[in-house]
Structures are given as structure tokens and as C-alpha cells.
From Swiss-Prot:
It comes from Saccharomyces cerevisiae (strain ATCC 204508 / S288c). Residues 698-873 form the Integrase catalytic domain. Residues 621-678 are annotated as: Integrase-type zinc finger-like. It is found in: Cytoplasm; Nucleus. The record marks 439-440, 620-621, 1255-1256 as: Cleavage. One of its GO terms (cellular component) is nucleus. Initially, virus-like particles (VLPs) are composed of the structural unprocessed proteins Gag and Gag-Pol, and also contain the host initiator methionine tRNA (tRNA(i)-Met) which serves as a primer for minus-strand DNA synthesis, and a dimer of genomic Ty RNA. Processing of the polyproteins occurs within the particle and proceeds by an ordered pathway, called maturation. First, the protease (PR) is released by autocatalytic cleavage of the Gag-Pol polyprotein yielding capsid protein p45 and a Pol-p154 precursor protein. This is Transposon Ty1-H Gag-Pol polyprotein.
Amino acid sequence: MESQQLSNYPHISHGSACASVTSKEVHTNQDPLDVSASKIQEYDKASTKANSQQTTTPASSAVPENLHHASPQPASVPPPQNGPYPQQCMMTQNQANPSGWSFYGHPSMIPYTPYQMSPMYFPPGPQSQFPQYPSSVGTPLSTPSPESGNTFTDSSSADSDMTSTKKYVRPPPMLTSPNDFPNWVKTYIKFLQNSNLGGIIPTVNGKPVPPMLTSPNDFPNWVKTYIKFLQNSNLGGIIPTVNGKPVRQITDDELTFLYNTFQIFAPSQFLPTWVKDILSVDYTDIMKILSKSIEKMQSDTQEANDIVTLANLQYNGSTPADAFETKVTNIIDRLNNNGIHINNKVACQLIMRGLSGEYKFLRYTRHRHLNMTVAELFLDIHAIYEEQQGSRNSKPNYRRNPSDEKNDSRSYTNTTKPKVIARNPQKTNNSKSKTARAHNVSTSNNSPSTDNDSISKSTTEPIQLNNKHDLHLGQKLTESTVNHTNHSDDELPGHLLLDSGASRTLIRSAHHIHSASSNPDINVVDAQKRNIPINAIGDLQFHFQDNTKTSIKVLHTPNIAYDLLSLNELAAVDITACFTKNVLERSDGTVLAPIVKYGDFYWVSKKYLLPSNISVPTINNVHTSESTRKYPYPFIHRMLAHANAQTIRYSLKNNTITYFNESDVDWSSAIDYQCPDCLIGKSTKHRHIKGSRLKYQNSYEPFQYLHTDIFGPVHNLPKSAPSYFISFTDETTKFRWVYPLHDRREDSILDVFTTILAFIKNQFQASVLVIQMDRGSEYTNRTLHKFLEKNGITPCYTTTADSRAHGVAERLNRTLLDDCRTQLQCSGLPNHLWFSAIEFSTIVRNSLASPKSKKSARQHAGLAGLDISTLLPFGQPVIVNDHNPNSKIHPRGIPGYALHPSRNSYGYIIYLPSLKKTVDTTNYVILQGKESRLDQFNYDALTFDEDLNRLTASYHSFIASNEIQQSNDLNIESDHDFQSDIELHPEQLRNVLSKAVSPTDSTPPSTHTEDSKRVSKTNIRAPREVDPNISESNILPSKKRSSTPQISDIESTGSGGMHRLDVPLLAPMSQSNTHESSHASKSKDFRHSDSYSDNETNHTNVPISSTGGTNNKTVPQTSEQETEKRIIHRSPSIDTSSSESNSLHHVVPIKTSDTCPKENTEESIIADLPLPDLPPEPPTELSDSFKELPPINSHQTNSSLGGIGDSNAYTTINSKKRSLEDNETEIKVSRDTWNTKNMRSLEPPRSKKRIHLIAAVKAVKSIKPIRTTLRYDEAITYNKDIKEKEKYIQAYHKEVNQLLMMKTWDTDRYYDRKEIDPKRVINSMFIFNRKRDGTHKARFVARGDIQHPDTYDPGMQSNTVHHYALMTSLSLALDNNYYITQLDISSAYLYADIKEELYIRPPPHLGMNDKLIRLKKSLYGLKQSGANWYETIKSYLIKQCGMEEVRGWSCVFKNSQVTICLFVDDMILFSKDLNANKKIITTLKKQYDTKIINLGESDNEIQYDILGLEIKYQRGKYMKLGMENSLTEKIPKLNVPLNPKGRKLSAPGQPGLYIDQDELEIDEDEYKEKVHEMQKLIGLASYVGYKFRFDLLYYINTLAQHILFPSRQVLDMTYELIQFMWDTRDKQLIWHKNKPTEPDNKLVAISDASYGNQPYYKSQIGNIYLLNGKVIGGKSTKASLTCTSTTEAEIHAISESVPLLNNLSHLVQELNKKPITKGLLTDSKSTISIIISNNEEKFRNRFFGTKAMRLRDEVSGNHLHVCYIETKKNIADVMTKPLPIKTFKLLTNKWIH
């Protein structure tokens, strides 16, 4: 450590901030701090002289200016007005320094808190300001430890000794040489000891001082180290003990020491609030802080012990249950009182986990109870304990104690008829004659309980316990799957549990059951008298060791925890269990099988079971009468609007739901059943507060007190659909009403209120007295207020900011919306039917019983229960009868979806998507085999057709017998007339309806039946959203809807390009989103529409044969410029003649008349490019299934990482099934699933505005680089790494010496700060970093970021070599066998003089913060330093080295032999002759400190680190560019979870994902944190992408546009990109040397564009640049203008590439004198035709006409060859859209791998 040099002038006094100030003789009644500076005792002549010349307080004086703070004051004196801990400094008026503490090279003053200003720091009296320990006692460090005894004298003795040893504390001398540091530090330590600070010095035994407190959260740990520090300082006796009292009384000296050290190591800003509260009362009461801290430590210890005890509970009945209960409840109460809340669920889990023995089965009973409490659990424990105590001597025991087994080796067997044994002592009999009892209980397979038992030692063969595979019913039995399940952690896999309490054998697997048959008369109950459903009964056959076979009866049920083998049934076949020998044996002693003891149970292996050939359908399909078969719970759950199981059971028990009873439902899966639609639709943050309204109203009669609230608006809906709804809830009955609203106007609200009041008055003969509402304008307006006043109704408004009072209406709206989202998610119906889902939910909710009242709202209102047979699941597919068809041969059925029962008739409201209307009708048939969204999730075999038929049979019979068929059904919510639609499109509708019910559909033949009511299964799918502007009447649903309309390849041209049918196809009817064979005879559901209008497209018609007829249909064929266009974004096309269009079919690549001197120019350009090799594709024939296909209008505006604007996305029709890599990435969410769950691919544009959303952000300019440097305090002051700290200190001295050597500032004069204009004063700082080669570097820099504009010339620029120039030079070096030499110029900027008059503060080690020095050199960080250095080195290279700068490319210099690329202080030299490089180096060394990093003279592979690129170069062969080492170091520091699932990504993103642009709701602190995180992540990704990972630029650019919109989705996509970078960090950009026979250089730009796939229909454009077949750069960006067609987007992309292509051409010609050929490659033939066309009239009126004309002139004037490239070979495709894995790899694996 260096000394503190305060000044170079001797008259400035020196001293430490911690040194005491001693005065001369002072009277006892006088404050020593009032003594003037002239009376301070001088300690040498120099200081005497200095003091005589001063008129103010010396710089080192510790005398404060506010004298009242230094005088003794009682603890009651309030703290200063600026707060309890204002920073104050011990200084004179001219020495203000805002910088505060500065630890290495400290400034001349130190700020002081009220600690230091207190009387304890400067105690009054004649003694010195820093009390000294008497010589008899010594310093705290020199005395024995407190354990050896107390050696302190009393306070009077200490005072006298200190008074006698009074002396002035002399500061240490100045350090003048590094060699003197050992001697100097000894004097410095002596100085600290004399200043009563010896306790902070590490002792000889190495005991450290306490660390600095840096956070309030660290205070508990810090105070432990501080107490240890006091103990090491022989002050352990003053520390409070457990009872809060110290061993001895603290002296004044010790209190001073305690006070000083506490304030040094615990800065006030880092103290906890409770510590600050103590100090605010008495800022000297450190002892109270220590006492309180020790109390907290003891409390934390008790809490930890309680938590450990609770987590390790063990109970087996050996102790009384009361004692166990008391112990547990006391622990829980203590934890709750200490703020650690243990809820019932957690407590029950912890208790049950510790149960063993007879109590272990209670682990699973919780699955049969909802919300089990601790008290309920202990009731069960007490019941078992009492039963255990009562039957200990009388109960037959099959698992005896070892003492019992000595006397009797045989277990007791009962050969009599099995009888029921109940655990509950209150229920000993069972009324059912054929009742068996299972010893364990049914449980879920996913039980989270754990087992603490371990397998006991056994003489039997070892058993494999790690089989975790589940053998499901119906799975083929193999040897490897005998151990089929592991249902719980304490089960022994592959074994049967031997149970003496079970009267029947039960097994979960059907594969061991022989002769299975149903037996509905058997009723099995568990220990808690709950029914266990039985699927079948059969025989269990054994083949034992003695080759004997036997069988017993077995019951099949999946609802048990273990497979149970009844000892009673074994005894019936003469088999007993001997637990002494641990074997099964016959009565004659023949051993049959070993027994294994595992945990508390005994087991026998399943290997002795004979498997059967029975299949699962045989078990499940055993004939059972419909009268006895129970309804599956998932079916009832969906039928009743996805209500929870508890509510449904209450409703059935209380008959609020009629037609069947609670026993008719299979509740076995109700507890563990998770409905995916409920999880998605009902996801919520937290629950509303219940019971809060009770303080606002009294008790009312039914329908006298109503709650109301309005929800909405719902955006992007058709005009016919409501945007709001208003709900009403009766306080007493909880009856609900909902009414749709299209707006929130006063008259609309008034109409609803009039309706609801009239309904209640007429139907319930009640009068509404009070209506509770919020303070929305729709309720507080004068019109409604007068209406309520007129009707005598009191409006009850919620108070401001008291939303709790409106809990009833809020909870109802939340419940209805949860149900709505769930119903829409489950059914797949469009969003404009949302209110129908609300109505359906309201009907059901009014019929469900409340758990509190045990009645439903309908029962409270006096209404009958809801007949469930009148309900259909929401969205149930049906076929509606068309009562008025267009003709007699017209199909009579229309596909539809059931919504809810009609309010106005006995009919049902059904949605007809083909007609865009809903009808009220009874003329419908349920469509079998289709459970709407059940195919989306794995519902196993949940098909409810039979259940639905049984349920609705009585209702349909009622309709058939009692209702007269109406001639006209009631139409509601119709967008247009039903009959008129049929008349407009008769042929179209006929095709649709015939397809919808065609028996030749793709359903397997086995699904057809002879029942006339059953309709064949069809893949009908409700559309996710319907555009209100679509006029087609045949919008049929598909099973899965693709986010991107599929484009089929219609014809393969002779050139290899693809003509695409420019019409989106509906997704086919299959599980996967793929097309079947085009020649398949199965029909497909396509969309039909009218023919295209002439003003939209210029099509020729291709004849297509229709199915089953001789007439030819025509499919519109797109013209050439339409091949890249999507119908959803149609724009006026360019009219091209037929001859021009046809000519494009045969000329590939296309040549211009004036740019093709040779026939094979274009071929040679394409031949050298790293394009993918594609297998030849046969011509694709059109399918007979094609009809006239309509467009789909879409208004999608979501920002995309692929999807709807993807002009190059298509699907090959003749492919039977596309592979996984063609459709999706390895992310498990597919494109279809993502869009179904998160997006609305047919939604209109959103009107919401996002907060913090910017319209467009440039990828690089918006990114802040990651800070890799350290500040002075981080590198040295607070650096805990001693070795690293030493290296940084060495780097610091090296930098200072370099600055002095370079004469960076004027050392002859120091300026006073007041003399200099403040705007010319530049702040300075030291920054430290660790370079990639491991060296530590320090840099003294100026704060140019706050530099005044008047101090530099804004016109000067700091130039560095462009990355394209470096890549071009490297590429030419490889092709021409150049030597590459890398140089570094040390402190380059310091070689440049500075013209302006600027001043900086001196470095910290000088200690001259009040002085300034004038700069002479361009210090790093100044605005002008870069420009000054550039001019300096440029002048030297030109004049002394004979170089010249390449025009247009700054920092690129060349002469006849050498090329130099300059990047600040790094130089890269390229030359054919290595001696030429050496000559340049010799010249540079004459002027600059030049270091050779890599001479590059080896002929083997040479590794470089050039500007962040890790380059491997072997002259004449190859060059590889990567960043593996850098990424390996940097990415883990980003705190991104890497490889969370242990797998690697194969693509950086997923096709078809859209960034949701809804309003971002986030608090400000979290927003700033996430923006900062995005800046770090995208900053690193951008750095890597623009260096060499050009394949990632699209993703980087898209995410960079959302840096200021850090939603969860954006962050997840960014994490995925970083994950891909990590997985592919070893990838390199590969270059190979060009063929030596090539006569010229070839510079090519490949262009591509994705039309309208960015927000607001902006297009993404991308370009890749190649030199001699080597990729040297790429660019991906969003088009600045909104393009109106694909052609315009392609023209925009090409025009963006031309300027850079021309500049690169000039650079290549300057560096290499070979001729150059320039090429432009695109996959847009329409763009090429425009460029080569001479006809200007055809696009004169187009939006892009001027840009096209300019592009044509540039192509002609710059001799550019425009060539066509196949889309599948266009590697620029990766710049414009996310691609499937296979395509992404195909386009990139040749140039980066």
C-alpha cells in the first residue's frame, strides 16, 4: 500500500483522519474543540512554520465547524435536521470535496457521520481526543483473550493512567521509495495503535478484522464477525450474554473503541432499519444493537430447529397419539407466531411423510379429501391408535415380533369364509353380503409422498429396485416390463404385497388376469369404507418353484396403491406364509417362493405369475348394462361447464342437478384429474378477498340487494357480436343474470336495468331495494341516477380505492370469464361467440350448489333443478336439419356447434359456421366421435358418445313425442339471411355440405354403424376466429389450423424453380399438420369461393379433373410476379404479356443484354457459391381433390419470428408425411399448438397501444454494450481476490509510469480549481479489465461522456476499419497466399497532441483533489482523442511508410506490397512477402512502442485473435473464423439458464411464432431491470452476429426491435437465442482457398425479402455478400417503407444491397488488381423481369416505379449480372424469416459449421 501524499508543498500539514488532535493546557470548563488553531501544539519546526503562515484551520485539522455537534450532549438531543445520518466532513471552508471516501490514494479529507461528530469520538476533558489504553492494560490486541480472565483495571485507574501518558499522536512519515515500504508500514501500524485503532489490525495469528458491511441484508452475518472481532480484541466480557447482560461493565475507553470500530466497518447507509431506529434515539448505544442482534440469533436458531424437527417427524404408534399431536401443534404455533406460516396442506404433507407402520396408509387418504386440515388428520391417527391399543392382544397378527416367531414359525391362517374387517371401531358390520375389504386405499399414481423406509436384509436373491417404467393396460408383456409400475416411492417394484387384512386379492395390471369377466355385484371398500371401483374379476395363476401351478380369484382395479395378495385366499388353496423362514409354503412344508421384507411390509415376486393373453379392450369392453355403468367424471366435468368436483358433488347430493345421482358418476379420477382447458382458461394470479362486503350491508330478503358490474370491451369482434356484458347477482340467493351490451352508453345501461327490474318483479314478486355498483361513469350518470330514484332504489357505490367492497360482482365476472376462456379453448370456437360461453356458464352456475348453503341459486329462488339431459357440452358438433333447402337434391344437413339452451323455446342455440349465424332449433343430431378439443390433449380414451346418448335419450324421446316440428326455426345473431346465402352460392354450399357428411370421408371403416342416427366421424373443427369481412359461406372448421396458410407446389419448371399455387389451403384432417398423398381417394375439406376478379390477378387457367365427373374445373394459375405473393396481402399486379411471362420459364439464370459478354458468366457465378445440394424432385401433379379455392382475408399485424407473411413457405402435396424437422423445431410447442394457444392467426389488427413500445429500432444503435471493465473500488479497494488485486495494482503503476513517460500532462505547474473555467475541466477515472490473453490492464481515461461541446470539434471523426473491409482483406489474403501479421501499439492515443486547452484532476495517488493539471496529449476517453490519433497515424503511414489510404474505406492503407487494416491501436498487415511486413514494422518502431502479437511466418496453422475473432489460418488452404473461447467465457456471465433440459437446440427459433403486442403491464423497477437484461443479451448476440454468425441476424434484428418491450415472451425468445448460441459456440465460418484457375474475382450479393411479416405489414429484407464463394458479411433489417406486394419487397431488398456491393467492388479492385465480376442473385422472377424490361409504361403508375427505375439504372450502369436462384437454394432466406430445422441446416451447413 502506498502512503498518502497530500501535497508536494511542505507548508501543508499532514495527518490521518483517524489521528487525535491534542491541545495545550485547557481549563476543565472549556471545550477543547474551541481552542483556536494557533494554540495547537506544533510537533516539528516545519509544522510550526506552516502554522504561523496560516490564518485558517489547517487541512489536517479534525476540528468541526459545527461546534455544537462536537460538544457533549445527552442522548435525547435530536439528530441534525438533514436526517439521522447526513454525511459531514472534517475540513475547512475551502476544502469541500463531494467525492467522499477514497481508499487507495486517499484524498485529503474524509466525510464523517454523526458517529464521528459525537462526544464519544471527541470526549471532553484534558485527555487526548483518542483515549489511550494504559500501559498496564495494553491495547486490545496485546491482552489475553477474555477466556483466560479479565485483566482490565477499573475505570478510575484507566483514567489516571491515560492522563499520565498524555502525548501528541505523531503521524507516520511520507513514503518516498518502494524499498522503504516495509519500514514505513511498521510506523503506520504504530500510529494506528497510538490512535486507539489497534483492534482493526490483523494479529500475528492471522485473525482478520471484520469485513465492511455492504448491504442491510448482510447485517446478521456481519454482526457475528464483529462479535468475534471483539472477542479477539479481549473485549468478549462486554458482549451481552443469553440473558442480555454482559459479564462486566464497559469502560469509557472500551466504549470509544467499540463506537469507532462499529462506525468504520458498518457504514450508516447499509444499516438495517431497526438499527437506525436505535441510533436515531441514541447514536452511541452500540451495546443495545449487539444485545438485540444476539436475541435475533437465538430466535432464528429456534425457528431453524422447529423447521428441521417438523421436516423429520417420525411416528409409528410407539408413543401416545396425544403426545405426538401436542408436539406437532406446538411447533406449528411457534412458527406461525414468528411469521413463518405453515398452512394445512404443507403441515399434513410433513406429518404424513413421517408416518410408518399401520399409519402409513394415511399418506394416501388425503387424496380422498379436499382441503384436509391438521385436526382432521390427527383424528384419523387417534382412531388407528385406539384401534391398535384395543386389538393388540386379540387381533391375528401375520407379522410377528421376533420373540413370537421363536415359539411358532407358522403364521395364523383362516380357512373360513372371508369376512369384512373394518378399521373404524364404530363400524364393525357391513350390510352387503358380497363385500370385500382391501387393506390399503386407492391413490393417485402421482402421489408426492415419500418413504423413509429401507429394504431390510434378506437371504433371498437381490431385487432390482430401479425399474421406473409403467406398463399400461393393453401394452404387450415382455420380460423387461414385468415390473410394470412404480406407483409410489415405498412400493417394491415387480412384487405383490402380502396382506392379512384383505379378504380379496386385487391387482392393477390386466396382463395377469385369466378368464376375465365382469361382476357388477362385487363391491370392494377400503379401510375408510370408501368404494373401490372394480373393472373385472378373473383368475390369478401361479407357477411356483416346485413346478406346481395353482390359481386364486383376483379383482382388477387401477385405483389402489399396491397390488394386494390376500393371505386368506392363499390359505384357501393350502398355501401359508412363514415369516420365520420368509417363504410361502404348503402345509407339508414344501417351499414355493421366497418372501421379501421391504419397509414395513412383506412382498412376493410377480415372476411366479403366469401372464395372460387378454388385452385391455377385453377388460374395458366387458359387456356391462347401461343402467349400471357409471359416467366418467371428465365427461360430467365438461358437461357442467368445467365446474370443480366439489361443487358438482354438492349439487348432485342436494338434487340441484337432476336425472342421475352422485353414485352414477365415477369419482375415482376426480381428485387427481387435471383438465388442460381449465388450467389454460382459468389461470389466475390471486383470489379476491372474501367476506369484505359484510361491513357494507345488512341482511336482505331474496332479490332485494343486487350486485352489478360491467365487463369489457372485447376487441376485434364482428359488429354483430357484443363487446360488453353486464352481470347482476342477488346477495341472498346468489342468482345470476347476464346481459350482452354493444356499448356502454347511458340508454343501453338504462334498458338493461329496466329489464332486470321488471323480470324480478314479475317472476319473483320482489322489489329491488339496493343495487351495489362501482363508480364507473355508466353507473354514476344522471340518467341512471334519476331512474333509480324514481323507482325507490338506493344506489350503493364503492368508496374510492376500496375494491374489496365489490367482491361479489368482481368474483362473478372472474368466474364467468374463466369459464368463457375454458369453453372457447376446449371447443375451439371463434372468439365472437364469447358471450354464448358466458350464457352457458351462467345457466350451469345457477344450478350448482354452494358448499356453504348446500343449495343452488335456483333452489334458493324456488325454481326446479336443472335437467342435465337437456344440456350438451359447449361446442358439441351437431348436424342441423335444413328445413328449407335450395333444391330437392340439396343436402339437408348443416354442420354446427351447440352453444346453450334457448331461453325462449325448448330448442338449443346452435352456431352454423358455414352461414355465420346462430339458430334456435330442436332439429339437430349429435355428431358422434368428435369431442371438439379433446384431440388437442392426451385424454387417453375419453370418448363420451355412449354417455352422451344415454344422457340425452330421454330428452330426445320427449321432443319426438311431444313437440310438433316447426316449419321455421328461430334465427338469432344473424349476419345475413340464411336463404339469401344459399341463393347466392348454391353450388358452393352444396359442395361444402356434401363433403361435411360424406360417408366416403377419411374415417376408418370401423366407425360406421347401421344406426340411422349415427353420423360418420368427420374432422370438423371450429375456426379459431372469423373475420367479419369474409363473405364466403363455407368456412368449415379444421382439426388443427396452421398459422400460415399452406401453399402447395403445383408444377416444377424446367429450370428447377417452383410455380406455386397462390392460394392457401385449409389444414387437412389428420393428427399432424401434413398433407396426404395427392392421389389419395380420400376427400379433403378445402375452402371454396367465387372466381377471382379481373382487377386483382392476371391468371391463366389450368384444367383440373374433378372427382367423379367429366367436367373440367379450372384452378387459377398465378403469373410470374405473383409467385411470391400471398392472396391475403393482394395488391395490383404488374401486367406482363404472356410471352414475357413464358420466357421466364426457360431462361435461368436470366441475362441482360449489355452485361453478359460470355454465355456462362452467370453459371460460373453460381457455381462457386456455398449453396445447398438439393435432391432432384419429380414433377408434382395436381390432386383431383382440388376445387376452386378462395382466399383467406387476414389482418394479422403481430410481430413475427416467421409465419403469415412468409412468402416462401409452402407444403409439397405429393409428400405423404413431412418429417418433424420440416414442421417444427425441437421446442415441444409446435406451430399449430402455439398459435392455437397464444395467437389468433385470423384476428384483425389490435387497437391497443403498448407502453414502452417503439415502432422500430435499429439492431445495433439501440444496443448498449456489456460493461466488461472494473472501477477502481471494484478492482482494488473492495477486491477480495488478493492475487487479482495485486495484478491490478501492478497494472495501475504501469499505467501511471506510461502516462508520465509520454508526458501526458504538464508536470511543471498545478492549477487551482478556481482559476479554470469549469467547462474546460474534465473528470478522470481509472478503469481495469482482464484481457482475453489473461493479462490485467489499467487505463487512465477522461470522462468524455460529460465533456462540454465547446471543448472539441464535433466535425472530427474517430475512424476505424470497417468489418467488411477486414473480412475482404482476410478473404483476399487466403486466395493469394498472403502473410498476416498482427501488431499492437501501446498507449496509441498518447502519441497524439491535443490542441484544446483542457484540464483534469490529478490521479488519486497524488492526493491533490483541489488542484488541476493541463493535458498535453489525447487522453483516452476524450471526444477528440480518436480523431487526433487517426490523423497522427495516418500522416505517419503516408509520409514515412509510403502507404496510401483507400478511397471510401477509412483505416485501410496499401502500397504495392502491403495492405494495412487499422483499428485504433491494432494493426493487421497483409503481404505476399513477409520481409515487406518486417520493413513496415521497423519503420513503426522508430516512432511508436510497437508490439508484434503474431508475425505469421509459419507454414502450419496459425491462430489469431483479431478484433474479437478467433481465426485459424493455414496459408494456401483454409481459414476458419469463430468465437468459441470468447463465448464460453461471456455467455455464462449473463445469468441465463443454459441447457435446462440437457439437450441442444437445432435452430435458433420456431417458425410461426408471433410476438404478442398487447399492452405491457409491469412496474417501473422491474421494467428497467428487464430492459437492462435485454440490452446485455442482445448486445452480445449482435456483437457475435455481425462478426461472423450471419445466420442469426434475423433473430437478433427482430428481438432488438423489442428491447424496450421486455415481455415474458420476448425474454423467452431471447433466452432461446442465447441457448442456441451456447449450443453452437464451436461453430466457425469456413473459407477455402479459391481455385487458382479463376481469372477474376467474383463479388456476389444474394437477396431475399419476406413480405409483410413484421408489425404494421412491414417487410423483412436480407442480403448476404460473398467474395470468391466466401461469405464475408450479411444484413437483416426491416424495410423502412411498407411494401404493397412481394415484388416491391424484393425490389427494396435488392436496391439496399447495390450501394454496398459497389463499394466492396471498389475495395477489391484497389487491394487486388484482378478483374472483378459482380452479381445480384434473387429468387423473384418478377423482379428480374422488371430489371431487364425496356417497357416503362407497365409500372409507371406503380408505387415502386421510381425505385424500380433506379434499380434498373444501377444494374446497367455498374455492370451487375442479375441471376435467378431457386428459393430452396437461397441462403439469404435465413435473413428474413425463421426456418424449420431441416431447411435451416440445409441453407447454412456449407458455409458455417
